[in-house]
Amino acid sequence: MVFQLICSTCGRDISEERFALLIKKIALKTVLKGVKNSCCRLKLSTQIEPQRNLTVEPLLDIN
């Protein structure tokens, strides 16, 4: 699941580009070729969160 990402400067929805980066694993350089606005390019380059590891490891081994 990819959360919606809107450029705060121009208001363009850049969720499809984020989907390509995170889910399809397409390189940032390739994705940015289709993005014309410099504000959107900057947001995609700097504010993409890495995929989170949601596994929880116990801190104490209680036996």
From Swiss-Prot:
Q: What highest taxon heads this organism's lineage?
A: Viruses
Q: Any idea where this protein resides?
A: Virion
A Pfam family it matches: Chordopox_RPO7
EC number(s)? 2.7.7.6
GO BP terms in the entry: DNA-templated transcription
GO molecular function list: DNA binding; DNA-directed RNA polymerase activity
Q: Give a Gene Ontology cellular component term annotated to this protein.
A: DNA-directed RNA polymerase complex
**Signal peptide annotation:** none
> Has keyword Nucleotidyltransferase?
yes
Chief location category: virion
From the UniProt record, list the reaction(s) this protein catalyses. RNA(n) + a ribonucleoside 5'-triphosphate = RNA(n+1) + diphosphate
Q: How does it assemble?
A: The DNA-dependent RNA polymerase used for intermediate and late genes expression consists of eight subunits 147 kDa, 133 kDa, 35 kDa, 30 kDa, 22 kDa, 19 kDa, 18 kDa and 7 kDa totalling more than 500 kDa in mass. The same holoenzyme, with the addition of the transcription-specificity factor RAP94, is used for early gene expression.
Function, as annotated: Part of the DNA-dependent RNA polymerase which catalyzes the transcription of viral DNA into RNA using the four ribonucleoside triphosphates as substrates. Responsible for the transcription of early, intermediate and late genes. DNA-dependent RNA polymerase associates with the early transcription factor (ETF) thereby allowing the early genes transcription. Late transcription, and probably also intermediate transcription, require newly synthesized RNA polymerase.
The molecule here is called DNA-directed RNA polymerase 7 kDa subunit
